[in-house]
């Protein structure tokens, strides 16, 4: 099969940002200018192509990352070939950070959208951290330059100070707010004015207005200096006082962007059709093709110590990462995969190396939001949806049967909030199980479990909005009506002291008995470790080796159920160092029970404490309500961190326990007459004060 587009002409990019910075509108404009859509969709009309779930159109926010393919040859057709863009539009709401995380994992570059009026917002920082984690080169696009309070250079300064990255403006604004006219292209040193008659598809170039010439010269000098640092050749030329050509400036900026040293910064107003075509040009000029990023690394499934690499090349063995599972009403399960190397044709068999299972590829489609075009092959650099996969979950590797590899997996955060759901009727009961199973397969940050004591179904997620959407989707997509309980906080338990505990389970009353006996030393685990670190210190066979795994299992099972108030015990070290056995009566079950009994005693002997999730909260409020907001956050046991000012008002940052934040949106609205906004995200677990912990422990014991 001949590749239709050379890999050098690919750009796999994500459009990422804070809620309401204008991501989806920007993506809609991209689809319009690249000719995929003949009519623009507006978010506030509920007609945006990329927002294809019913709830997205109603709420005006993007929840799932829709993937789409588009082609671009330049705003003035200046490139010799058409470039192929695979674009992923991601949600900006903090409850859906998981969608952003998994998109960034498979992208080669990102366009981070900021609002010219609001600047760097809390979610912008989260997205930026995620992009740093996966070393994603990026452009900054300062949108909404027509809005009141928009100030391009202020946002540039914030990117530098708050995000700690080196922004390099390659454009400047001509006018701002309602007088925003266009931009200055600092590379060509021309003023650009957009043509309203064709919805900003074309523009005219003029000389830079005299009053902006000095500013343009100053920022152009910064840009050239940034480009010249790319390599010795350009540096020498720059130091010798020679003029760098346009090609050299672009090459220098490109090299440093791909190395994640700088962020080229551009501007526009997507809604007013000013600037998006130049952003597409910048994606081609400065963001990498799949062949320009380092080879993807992985391990050999048979030998975890053996590191393997796959280069973005059709001749290499096939490897791909399944980064998203979606349920489609017509074809069933869609597995979105990013192909890193090799070629795959429909009908081929691949290995799911994480699960060790063979999968046959039925059909493959390329997605345009929720429209599908069937394709026969996918090559290195492609993003496509595979139909008919049975056992694939997010983060699994698909690879060549004969050349297995496990690509680096994605880390998903644990949920911080739970609610009980109950089906309204008997008919809903069965459907609810199926619906929740499918939704959990799609979204790794969403969990479902059954409470053993009450028999209730408990769903857990990243925030109230996250769970609202899940329940809403159950109703719409699976016709399941359910009642929702009050939100519950996902507490954790941890021990403070090191202690040695004897676990003894003996039942001997004639016939085959039970005999399990062990001594275990428990200690708090190392910082940053979540689970159990188990050490076998048995010498001389006082406990036979075959019973050691049963002891570990007994500890792990008790950790799941906790020792204090029924919440999972985390961050534990356990060393089994002594014990005894009986030739006839000892068995695995007896040792498992003995270890479990020893672990239970940690509530007293280990000084077990309750941990509560703490949220990073950021409130933006008009100045006159600042005192009320601060007082209210303090009453909620909040620790005020710092604050600053933006045109939107005062910004207050605090850390507040999640248990105190339920219903905060409503009380904040009434306190500020609906003029303040807030966002929060999980930051860490911290020890709950005794007064709170005692109440929770008593409640769990039914006192």
From Swiss-Prot:
List, alphabetically, the SMART domains matched. Answer: EFG_C, EFG_IV
Tell me which residues make up the tr-type G domain: 8-291
Q: What NCBIfam families does the entry give?
A: EF-G, PRK12740.1-5, small_GTP
- Report residues binding GTP: 17-24, 89-93, 143-146
Q: Which UniProt keywords are given for this protein, alphabetically ordered?
A: Cytoplasm, Elongation factor, GTP-binding, Nucleotide-binding, Protein biosynthesis
Where does the record place it?
Cytoplasm
| GO molecular function term, any single one | guanosine tetraphosphate binding
> What GO cellular-component annotations does this UniProt entry give?
cytoplasm
The job of this chain, per UniProt, is described as: Catalyzes the GTP-dependent ribosomal translocation step during translation elongation. During this step, the ribosome changes from the pre-translocational (PRE) to the post-translocational (POST) state as the newly formed A-site-bound peptidyl-tRNA and P-site-bound deacylated tRNA move to the P and E sites, respectively. Catalyzes the coordinated movement of the two tRNA molecules, the mRNA and conformational changes in the ribosome.
Which InterPro entries does the UniProt entry name for this protein? EF-G-like_DII, EFG_II, EFG_III, EFG_III/V, EFG_IV, EFG_V, EFG_V-like, G_TR_CS
Is Cytoplasm one of the keywords? yes
Q: What is its main location?
A: cytoplasm
What family does the entry list?
A: Belongs to the TRAFAC class translation factor GTPase superfamily. Classic translation factor GTPase family. EF-G/EF-2 subfamily.
Pfam families assigned to the protein according to its UniProt record, in alphabetical order: EF-G_D2, EFG_C, EFG_III, EFG_IV, GTP_EFTU
For this entry, the protein name equals Elongation factor G 2
- Keyword check for Cytoplasm: yes
- Quote the gene name from the UniProt entry: fusB
